[in-house]
Regions:
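Short hydrophobic beta-strand element within catalytic cores of glycosyltransferases
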Residues: 311-315, 320
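N-terminal strand-loop element at the rim of the active site
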Residues: 6-13, 19-22, 26-63, 174-177, ...
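A conserved mid-protein helix/loop that constitutes part of the nucleotide-sugar donor-binding site
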Residues: 17-22, 213, 222-237, 254-260
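Short His-centered aromatic/hydrophobic patch
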Residues: 86-94, 113-116
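A short, active-site helix/loop in glycosyltransferases that binds the activated sugar's phosphate group
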Residues: 147-189
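Nucleotide-activated donor-binding/catalytic signature segment of Leloir-type glycosyltransferases, i.e.
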Residues: 53-55, 257-276
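Aromatic "clamp/platform" in nucleotide-sugar-dependent glycosyltransferases that forms part
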Residues: 294
Length: 360
């Protein structure tokens, strides 16, 4: 079978890019011909590295250009592609490009939605602006704008669903959200395929003695989705109480300087900014994994961390958190119904930090 993965940025650092590389390599190892097509190349080489048998192709912007259409059409035809896996199903014009390029060909189109259907960066950005707006007129305007963007998102999702052979979500719990935002009642093309474990851990053997008194965050340092400031607000309540514990942040991003300034202002001494690193060694030694995102799909870091014995402490803003964690059994979830409360998150963490048996 001949497969083609299509995504916005590749090579690049991120969950979608990592999953793409892992799947491309696995399909190639199983004897399939695999191609990866991207519109933007952020880094020189992918991480993890692509198998030498996987071919990387470069398109460009604007997405709907005639040059992109001709190049994609030629690739689909000349390599006799059977399945296109669209990893960038929003905005809808990526799907429109695929359908134009596929016209008259027998290949199938799969759309993969890597987030909760009713949340994205644009919608969350407007919600954040509304929360900060002091002027009632501005708030009313932003509320209307948010409603319009939500309607546009729903229309875009309806288009992608209608023009794809299958529409893949990361959790069964997202099906209802998809139907709500699109207004669709007949959603028989929906499938659920969770993210794979993307960090190699075949040699790992859990040993409580190897675990250190460390809390861990892994991800982009940005304010829209990951909300790393919440992690630091939680840690600011914990650091004075637990002088032998450390917080490590593995990742980088546009909020790094602001987060470092917060640490300096609050005089937090045991916060380590590690930058982009292979997270596996950090998972191995961390006792707790902390994630306080405002929205997620099925976060790779939770799956990866749990596979290395790091106990997850999650903010339950995304329904798939409950697919991964059984509260009080293999981790803890702070319900999102009352909004994020750093004190409650810190109290949950403290309960685990004070009881070594709870961490094992």
């Amino acid at each position: 079978m001949n497969l083609l993965f299509l995504l916005g940025k590749f090579p690049s650092i991120g969950g979608v890019e990592t999953v793409t590389a892992i799947l491309a390599n696995e399909f190639s190892a199983r004897g399939h011909e695999v191609h990866v097509v991207s519109f933007e190349q952020v880094t020189e080489t992918p991480s993890p590295a692509l198998d030498s048998r996987v071919t990387l192709h470069r398109l460009g912007y604007p997405v709907s250009s005639q040059a992109n259409l001709a190049a994609l059409r030629d690739l689909l035809s000349s390599r006799r592609i059977d399945i296109v896996i669209n990893q960038w199903c929003l905005p809808f014009h990526v799907t429109r490009l695929c359908r134009k390029a596929m016209r008259g060909l027998s290949c199938r189109l799969l759309a993969v939605h890597h987030n909760a259907p009713d949340c994205n960066a644009r919608l969350e950005g407007l919600r954040m602006r509304m929360a900060r707006a002091g002027n009632p007129v501005n708030r009313a305007f932003l509320r209307l704008l948010l409603k319009g963007c939500a309607m546009a998102t729903g229309a875009s999702l309806r288009y992608v669903y209608a023009h794809s052979d299958r529409y893949i979500l990361l959790s069964d719990s997202f099906h209802r959200a998809f139907r709500n935002i699109t207004g669709l009642k007949n959603t028989g093309k929906l499938l659920t395929i969770p993210n794979p474990v993307t960090v190699e851990n075949r040699e790992f053997r859990y040993d409580p003695a190897f675990k250190k008194k460390e809390l861990l965050f892994v991800g982009r340092l940005e304010p829209n989705q990951k909300r790393v400031s919440r992690v630091l607000e939680t840690w600011a309540l914990l650091e004075p109480r637990f002088p032998d514990w450390t917080l490590r942040l593995v990742g980088d991003g546009p909020e790094k300087e602001a987060l470092q300034a917060f640490c300096a202002e609050r005089r937090l001494e045991r916060v380590s900014f590690e930058g982009f690193r292979n997270p596996a060694p950090y998972y191995e030694q961390a006792s707790l994994l902390l994630l306080a995102s405002e929205y997620e799909g099925l976060p790779l870091v939770v799956v990866e961390g749990m596979s290395f014995g790091a106990v997850p402490l999650l903010y339950g803003s995304f329904s798939s958190a409950y697919d991964l964690v059984d509260h009080g059994q293999n981790g803890c979830i702070l319900p999102a119904s009352g909004g994020f409360q750093a004190r409650q998150m810190a109290d949950m963490a403290a309960g685990l930090m004070q009881s070594p048996a709870a961490l094992h």
